[in-house]
Amino acid sequence: MARVVFVHGVGKQYLSEDSLARDIVPELRGGVRLARAEAAARDGAGADGAVAVPAPEDVAVAFYGDLFRPAGTRADDENFQAADVESDLEFELLMAWWAEAARTDPQVPAPDESGTRGKVGWAAAQGLRLKTVRRALDALTGAQFLEGVRDRVLIGNLKQVVRYLTDPDIRIRAQAAVAAHLTPDTRVVVAHSLGTVLAYEALCAAAARGEKVNVQMLVTLGSPLGMRGVVLNRLHPAPVDGRAVWPRNLRAWTNIADTTDIVAVVREIAPAFGPAVDDLVVHNGTHMHDATRYLTAIETGRAVAAGLAGTADE
């Protein structure tokens, strides 16, 4: 069985486990190769003294994107518009992304919440909110790091996050896709974006079921886990007194975020998950949330290598 399990993020509904693996596995192995070369040079031990790069068959992709694929023909494809941002949670998440984009990109205007509050009628309030959603989408699609991304893609990704957090059936089936790859051989779990939420919850669930899973390292990339109102407070299991539960089957955790990744609104998650989390910052260039950019970062390679070597907390 695979020693490394990768859990993908949003927007993969038209891919498959195999197509994702073609992109993910080489980049993950490349990141470890960088860390291996660094360790060999530092220790002067040569390549034989560093952790081996995992073989392709040692890396598995936990795929759940099909759960978000719309049924029917191409004509039924989801052509989302501003009016489709309907729930309060969707609106809250969109506003968080907008605020973070404005904080990290001087070209993005900051949100003005004054238009969404006050003593107005329901219809007027809905009209103001729709106008705010349109402004948010305009701001985000004009951001330096989201140039070329369409409204329907942003809204679709937004809805996938919210559906996972609010739809019990989606949550159960998505976690089952991850759990299917967690075995006594699993040493490292690498997760990206929404996949970090799945990975965390799947590890907690496996521990609760008493399964023989002992992961040396969890590597979370571009994670929204630290967003208290939207994500953290909706986790299973729920946080206790503001502190999230540490999975009993996990030895070490490295959390990595790009300095401008708007999805990782809270880049330091140690305050919520405990001081054992090692929060690191990287720079992914113009593709701040791209999974392959994260995987090729040497910081990611080091974390994966430490997990494979069994030196995760040394």
Give a label for each model feature.
Residues Y64-G121:
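A basic- and aromatic-enriched beta-loop-alpha substructure that forms the phosphate/nucleotide-
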Residues M1-G65, R69-D76, T116-V190, L194-E314:
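Lipid deacylating catalytic domains
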